[in-house]
């Protein structure tokens, strides 16, 4: 029984395919410039999950930016609706955040997260990428 358990634990797909999210971006942008961030995922199919962008300014709480659904439709926070676009490429396993007209107050750690059930429940987060807006 132990041998069967050992084989199952170490060779089952769920153990082999770790599920990760990794954000990447420029690090620093100037005021009025545009920001483009990429979230690269592995271990699961983007087409099966809603993906969110969230940020946390220094010393403040988390702020939801927006979501792209499995079919590609998006919802953006009202305060950012005119500045943010979220897209994805299922084949490349990448989700993109485009934010225009960057301001100093947009300085924050930016995260992508996977929604596993309706109601903004997140089971996997990236480690985040820091974006600093400075001249």
Swiss-Prot record:
<dbReference type="GO" id="GO:0005576">
    <property type="term" value="C:extracellular region"/>
</dbReference>
<keyword id="KW-0391">Immunity</keyword>
<dbReference type="GO" id="GO:0016064">
    <property type="term" value="P:immunoglobulin mediated immune response"/>
</dbReference>
<keyword id="KW-0732">Signal</keyword>
<keyword id="KW-1064">Adaptive immunity</keyword>
<dbReference type="GO" id="GO:0019814">
    <property type="term" value="C:immunoglobulin complex"/>
</dbReference>
<feature type="signal peptide">
    <location>
        <begin position="1"/>
        <end position="18"/>
    </location>
</feature>
<dbReference type="InterPro" id="IPR013106">
    <property type="entry name" value="Ig_V-set"/>
</dbReference>
<dbReference type="Pfam" id="PF07686">
    <property type="entry name" value="V-set"/>
</dbReference>
<dbReference type="InterPro" id="IPR013783">
    <property type="entry name" value="Ig-like_fold"/>
</dbReference>
<keyword id="KW-1280">Immunoglobulin</keyword>
<feature type="domain" description="Ig-like">
    <location>
        <begin position="20"/>
        <end position="128"/>
    </location>
</feature>
<protein>
    <recommendedName>
        <fullName>Ig heavy chain V region XIG14</fullName>
    </recommendedName>
</protein>
<dbReference type="InterPro" id="IPR036179">
    <property type="entry name" value="Ig-like_dom_sf"/>
</dbReference>
<dbReference type="InterPro" id="IPR007110">
    <property type="entry name" value="Ig-like_dom"/>
</dbReference>
<dbReference type="InterPro" id="IPR050199">
    <property type="entry name" value="IgHV"/>
</dbReference>
<dbReference type="GO" id="GO:0003823">
    <property type="term" value="F:antigen binding"/>
</dbReference>
<dbReference type="InterPro" id="IPR003599">
    <property type="entry name" value="Ig_sub"/>
</dbReference>
